[in-house]
Swiss-Prot record:
Keywords assigned by UniProt, alphabetized: Coiled coil, Mitochondrion, Ribonucleoprotein, Signal, Sporulation
Protein source organism: Saccharomyces cerevisiae (strain RM11-1a) (Baker's yeast)
Biased composition (Basic and acidic residues): 525-545
Ranges for region Disordered: 525-577
Annotated signal peptide: 1-23
Coiled coil: 379-416, 513-561
The keyword Ribonucleoprotein is assigned to this record: yes
Protein name: Outer spore wall assembly protein SHE10
Subunit structure, as described in the record: Component of the mitochondria-localized RNase mitochondrial RNA-processing (RNase MRP) composed of one single RNA encoded by the NME1 gene and at least 31 proteins. Absent in the nucleus-localized RNase MRP (NuMRP).
Function recorded in the entry: Involved in spore wall assembly. May be a component of the mitochondrial RNase MRP (MtMRP), a ribonucleoprotein endoribonuclease involved in the cleaving RNA transcripts to generate primers for DNA replication in mitochondria.
Gene designation: SHE10
Amino acid sequence: MGKLIKLITTLTVLVSLLQYCCEFNSGSISCERTQTLCHYTNPRVWNTYFSRNCELYKNKVSPGFDIVARKYDTAVKPVIDDATVKVNKVAIQPAFKVIHSQCKKWNCGKYYQLVRSPMVKTRRFFFAKYNAFVKPNIDKFFTAEFRSHLKERILKCKNIGHYYFTITSRCIKSKYDFIVGNTEEKLMGKFKNKDTHGIHGSVTHEPSSEDMVLTVSTMESDEEELTTTSTQTVVETITLDQEEASAVANHAHDDEASTDVEDSTDVNVNEQALLQEDFDMWSETILQKTQDVIQLFEKDVSKYIHGKLVEEANHFKAKFQSLDDKSKKFFSKISLAINDIECVEGIDSETGKKIFFDKSGSTEISQYITRELVREYFNETRSTLDELTNAMEKDLSEITDEIEKKVNAIREENVEVFEEWGDIIVNEWSKRMAYVDVINAHMGADDDTTLDEEKAKSSVNWKKFLKGKKQIIESRDKLAHHSADLSRVNAFRQKVQKKILSFTQESGEFLYILRSKANLQFQERERKERERKEREKAAAEEFQRQQELLLQQEEEDEEDVSYTSTSTITTTTTMTL
């Protein structure tokens, strides 16, 4: 069981690689065997075949296969194509140039046998494995019944081609036989009048089934030779006299007229039968064409969207990088301002003005940090980041609108292609049916019953024609309203919007943290300023109180001095008395 799984996996990989090579080199494959191998290993070919011949497969498996094929065309194939181009450009071409330049210097003749021997062994090994495991399964699949069915299909296509060729040749004949017939009759009359002893001329009859030439020539005055040649390469020679030759010529004209009537009847029958068969194929052709146009539309849309999103992804990557750099500059500016809130005041020795230093006192700052200044920094940061994010959202909306317009343009282009194809098909079928009606009117049978049957068939065919025309119109409407796969566009838009929202939230949270930190710094500075002012106020009050005490003490000292002086004067006066 494990070997069978490995074999199936190997065959799947080989078939996938083969199909990719066939599709990549579709315009440069000249070998018929390679083209046949590419055709019969294409899963889409077998899907179409089984859908037409197996109702269960058509209802159960084919829809899933179409979905997988569409996903492959839209999601996997563009990635593989880009990877192939990149690998070819980055690795294969440079390596080939290097190898080619080195091989010019080598004498590879002596290495030929060394390389050829392992390759021969490998080829024999693969052939042995193929004959042992793969070929029996292929022989079981390609049975006699399948081959006979395939042969019938090919013969049917061949008959249809032969039918169209016959119709074309008859159209040409119907236009020019009347002129040729009149010319032959005039020439025969002239020859009869001029030569009473012999007949010189030719009678040509071209029925649809075979080409026959009846030639009458006069060899002698008493003898004639009549030679009849057909496509069976049978030659009959008859010797007639003059009167018998004339009778044969007249009989040839009668045979031609009767044969034309029979051929017209055959044409009428074959036309009706083939027309009824082709109507069934017409419906399948319309469905297949509709499916092909839808696949082409989805492929073009996928290719355009892939290239557009890759381009815009690079642009938005640069925009997000610029947004991140600008936000870091604003945040750094605010952080420095917050750190400088706790600054140190000083006096310039030269000018005597106040100057400010950072909290370490080593670096001078440009200005004193206030609440109004920090609030201005926050508002500038918030407004700038909002402008940048709004511009990115606007660009994203414009890109989405541009993609939708381009998708609609691609859809309209494919619808126009289908309309042109439908107009040509309808015109060709209307001409063909009108041609069949003309044949029925002028070359129909004399029997009334047969005429009624032909009229009934013509009515049925015209109804089928109208049904096919309505089917084309419905298919056109289906193409016009077929929704494109914009899932990658929506995913890209959601991804960018999510990233913008994430950046907005992160920047808002960081600004909130910085604002809280700034408030704490300002509150701490204000607290210290209040304490300093209280200390200064207390020191001033203490100084004033000390001054008052000193003044009071001085006043008391002055009063003591005045009292001592008065006492001395009084004592002196008393003693004098």
